[in-house]
């Protein structure tokens, strides 16, 4: 618990093309070494490719992909007595989005396609189709929480 005043979360400026705060956050997560314009080009190219493949609007397809990767529960380590338990806890909405975006970007970076825009586009398409590495990561986290359901009463 903080001893000083609680610091409010900073408002993020929406992205210039779609005026979406969610997409702006995604661009910031993708950004490397402060090169935001390059990250924007990569994301917009990937979204354009994605919308062509799914026949949906760019932002709509992005939201569907994000929804399919968002985790609802995760496990946190909790020390009780001499042993550590993996306790399943519900994920807060802000963290849900952050985890989903991070997993999509990490999975895209690990792919072996030619350009980052293509890798990101393919990963987002896989997420829309409910397959791919990022969706597998979400299912893995859910499985872990399900396996440790017995320790749910240790929640804090």
From Swiss-Prot:
Keywords assigned: Ribonucleoprotein, Ribosomal protein, RNA-binding, rRNA-binding, tRNA-binding
GO cellular component: small ribosomal subunit
InterPro entries from the UniProt entry: Ribosomal_uS7, Ribosomal_uS7_bac/org-type, Ribosomal_uS7_CS, Ribosomal_uS7_dom, Ribosomal_uS7_dom_sf
UniProt cross-references to Pfam families, sorted A to Z: Ribosomal_S7
MF GO annotations: rRNA binding; structural constituent of ribosome; tRNA binding
GO BP, sorted A to Z: translation
Superkingdom, natural source: Bacteria
Complex formation: Part of the 30S ribosomal subunit. Contacts proteins S9 and S11.
Family: Belongs to the universal ribosomal protein uS7 family.
Xref: HAMAP family: Ribosomal_uS7_B
Function: One of the primary rRNA binding proteins, it binds directly to 16S rRNA where it nucleates assembly of the head domain of the 30S subunit. Is located at the subunit interface close to the decoding center, probably blocks exit of the E-site tRNA.
PANTHER family per record: RIBOSOMAL PROTEIN S7
Stated name of the protein: Small ribosomal subunit protein uS7
Biological classification of the source: Bacteria, Pseudomonadati, Pseudomonadota, Gammaproteobacteria, Enterobacterales
């Amino acid at each position: 618990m903080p001893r000083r005043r609680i610091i409010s979360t900073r408002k993020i400026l929406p992205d210039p093309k779609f005026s979406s705060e969610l997409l702006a956050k995604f661009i910031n997560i993708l950004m490397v070494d402060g090169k935001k314009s390059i990250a924007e080009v990569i994301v917009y190219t990937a979204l354009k490719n994605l919308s062509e493949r799914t026949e949906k609007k760019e932002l709509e397809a992005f939201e569907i992909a994000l929804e399919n990767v968002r985790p609802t529960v995760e496990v946190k380590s909790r020390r009780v007595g001499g042993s550590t338990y993996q306790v399943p806890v519900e994920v807060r909405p802000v963290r849900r989005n952050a985890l989903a975006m991070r997993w999509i970007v990490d999975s895209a970076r690990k792919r072996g396609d030619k350009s980052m825009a293509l890798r990101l586009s393919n990963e987002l398409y896989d997420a829309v189709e409910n397959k791919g590495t990022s969706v597998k990561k979400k299912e893995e986290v859910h499985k872990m929480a399900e396996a440790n359901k017995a320790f749910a009463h240790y929640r804090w």
